[in-house]
Every structure is written in C-alpha cells, then in structure tokens.
Amino acid sequence: MTDVRVRFCPSPTGTPHVGLVRTALFNWAYARHTGGKLVFRIEDTDAARDSEESYSAIIDSLRWLGMDWDEGVEKGGPHEPYRQSQRKDIYQDVLKQLIDAGEVYPAYSTAEEVEERHKAAGRDPKLGYDNFDRDLTEEQVAAFEAEGRKPVWRLRMPEQDWKWTDLVRGEVEFKSFTQPDFVVARSNGEPLYTLVNPVDDALMEVTHVLRGEDLLPSTPRQLALYEALKRIGVAKATPAFGHLPFVMGEGNKKLSKRDPQSSLFNHRDNGIIPEGMLNYLALLGWSLSADQDIFGVDELIANFDVADVLGNPARFDQKKLEAINADHIRLLEPKDFEARLRAYMTEYTEFPADYPAEKFAIAAELVQTRIKVLSEAWDLLKFLVTADEDLVFNEKAAKKNLKETAVEPLNAGIAALEAVEEWTTPNIEAALNKALIEDLGLKPRVAFGALRIGISGEAVSPPLFESMELLGKESTLVRLKVTREQTPFVVAE
C-alpha cells in the first residue's frame, strides 16, 4: 500500500469552527493511524477576506488540541512553500502547460449570451455554461479579441458519466450532462481554487482527500482535472476521496459559522478541555464502539479508519459535549487538573493569582468531580475570595433555608465552631455533627443548609466542612453571625 498522505488546507477567514476542526481531526487521526503524513497548507488567495489574525487562530486551535503536522506552514518540508499566495508562479506554469496541451481553452461568452443560447434552443436559461467556446475558429477568436474581450479559461470535461468509490459514501455517480466545462482561471489569468487545490494535491503527492460533504458535487471536476494533470506529467495518480458528513445545529439546519456553538474558541473559553473537545469532535461522524463514548487520543489513533465514518449528518449536542468533558476532567491527575484550573481561573475569572497554592490545591480537589466545564468552578469557589462584607445571598436559596427554624442550628453551630481550637476539616466536622446532629437531633439537610448559605451565599457549594477550613475560622464565624442577624431572611422590596 502506498504511504498515506492527507492534507488540511483551510482558508484563513474568520475564527476556527467546529466543522473545520473536525475535518482537521479526521485527517490527522487517519494519518497517525496509518503511519502516514499530514500536510498542512493555507489557501490564502482571497486577499479581501484572508487575514493573518485568522491564520494565527487556526494554528492556535490545532496546537491547543494537540494536533501536529508532518510538513506545512510553520514547519516546512519538501514541497515548500505551503501558502497558496506564495505559489502563484507554480500555478501559472501548470496553467500554461494545460493550455499548450489543449486541456484548457479560452472562453469568451458572457453569461447573458449563454442564457440567450439556452432560450433559443428551448432549454432552461439557468442551465449554466453550454461549452460553446470549446471549438472556436481562429476567425471567431480574432473577432472576440478585436472587441476587447478577455477570456476566462475552462477545462475540457470529457463527455462521460463520473463514478468513483467514495471512502465514506461508497459508490457515487454524476451524469455527464451535469458537468459542463468549468473555469480554472479568471480573465486576468489568475487561477481559481478549482485549479490550484488539485495542483497542490498533485505536487504534494496527496493520496487521500478527506473533506466536507459540501464539496461532493465538485468531485467530478477534480477527477477530470487530475486526468489532465496526469496527461501533462504533473500528477502521478488520482487520490481517493472521502466526503465527511455535515455537522447539524439546532433543528434541521447545518451548523452555521455564526452559531455560538460553532466557534471552537467559545468552547475553550467556557472551559472545555482539549481531551473533551477531541473526544466529542471524533464522535461527529465516527464512533469507537456502540457502548463507549469516552476515549482518549491514543485510543482514537489506534482505532480510527475513514471507512468507519458515517455518511449521515452528525448533530452537535452541547449537553453531550459537556458531559464528555466532565468525564475527561475527572480522568485528569489531581495535580494536572489543579494546574489547568488555576491557569483558567486566573485568565478568565476574577480569582486572584496570588491565592495560596496549598489552599488552591484543596479547592481544586473539591470541585474536580463537581463540574462539567472549568467555568463552573468560579461560581463554586468565588465565596473563598469574596470579602466577608461583600458576600451576597442567593435570594431563592436564602428564602428557603433561612427561615425562623434556622436560628437554632445557627446558634448551635456558631457556639460549636467557636470552641474548635485546631481549625481542620475533621475537627470542624466532629464539632458540628455533635452540636447539630447528636444534640439537636437534626437531619443533615436541615442542620447544615443555613450554614452553607451563611458561608457561601449559595445552596450548592463544595463540601461544607472543607469549605470552612479553606475560608478560615475568623471569616466563617463572621459570616455565620451576619447570617444569624438576617434570619429569618426577607427579600428586599
């Protein structure tokens, strides 16, 4: 078997979206699974839309997810350069060879003339180009040139049906009448995507083209161009094509670049970790097994085969992404999770960078099994870095838990905690259990509900006794005494 060579070739426009990165992942996983090579090049021939900011964002997205490449931008390789904007001389040379060989011809017809010819022949005027210019006489060409017309350049499409075995979809066929001669270069001689993309694939010896389903209708054109490139000695072989399924959003609509869920960086900023994102992206059209949704990158590489990719559209499910991410958060080693959480909290929240390391390690351990995304840690931990006088109660939680009956456990809890000399979790737990559970006979939910509101402001927090240890004895007692003063809690009008 020929060594596998796949490519990822995005245009540097906008921010990286889920569909784009899923395509990169499947190419990368296939290269790594087969021991092949991934070529990363940039299609930056649209000066009006391309940007260096977008280019940097694409690089950032791949590096964040841990996807590397064997040759391409930022790395180099035997087929440099890897940006299309730097390969224009190459395209012009290939275009000239195609013209000289008669594979490509000048077409002078305007869109209006094509429509008029269709109407005159009783055909649908919107059928598209009618191949009229393919065999113009020298006199006709001279007449058009005399008018000052500048031709576009079209590839001669063989009059045949187009069939191929798609790596994802199996046997695919397009009838010949659906494939008119198509433009490969503008009237100013500038080659189009329809030419430069296959030329790059040919020169870089790409063996497998894995790309989005939206490009499926253009495959006959690429196959025809490959045949022409082989005839002039530019291409050695035609690659195998595999068309990856659409990623759907809400309802039955394709996930749009404008959808917030489409933005990879939105997910990163919300606290999705790379392992969770990679796992979920892989599930958008592929699965490890019917009963295993959670897997790591090594399992993905060991098992990924493009032949197992489904042809049906994949649906993006935010809740499933977060559930998978939660599993990967729990799989992290505690020290690793602590470091990642600290970096995230420092960058994305108001959590102070100078919070004591030993306390943060405990806090991280308390929330690792309680969050789905890193951003949820802020709501659970912000009480630790809020000044006592600035703590605000969640009104709904306070109204439910700070009734007249809460005064007794608050009094008993405060008295018990004041007597604790060594402020540790076991001592705090023992003192409160004796005072509230044993002596007062309260159930834990009743006994500790008011205390939890008192120290955190919320009905849901990390474990109570550990939270009190982190908060410290002084702040714990100050907050509980303020809570007692505000019990029963009355919502301000």
Curated annotation (Swiss-Prot):
Extent of motif 'KMSKS' region: 254-258
GO terms under biological process: glutamyl-tRNA aminoacylation
CDD domains: GluRS_core
Assigned GO CC terms: cytosol
Uppermost EC category: ligase
The protein's assembly and partners: Monomer.
Family: Belongs to the class-I aminoacyl-tRNA synthetase family. Glutamate--tRNA ligase type 1 subfamily.
Protein name: Glutamate--tRNA ligase
Species this protein is from: Corynebacterium glutamicum (strain ATCC 13032 / DSM 20300 / JCM 1318 / BCRC 11384 / CCUG 27702 / LMG 3730 / NBRC 12168 / NCIMB 10025 / NRRL B-2784 / 534)
Taxonomy of the source species: Bacteria, Bacillati, Actinomycetota, Actinomycetes, Mycobacteriales
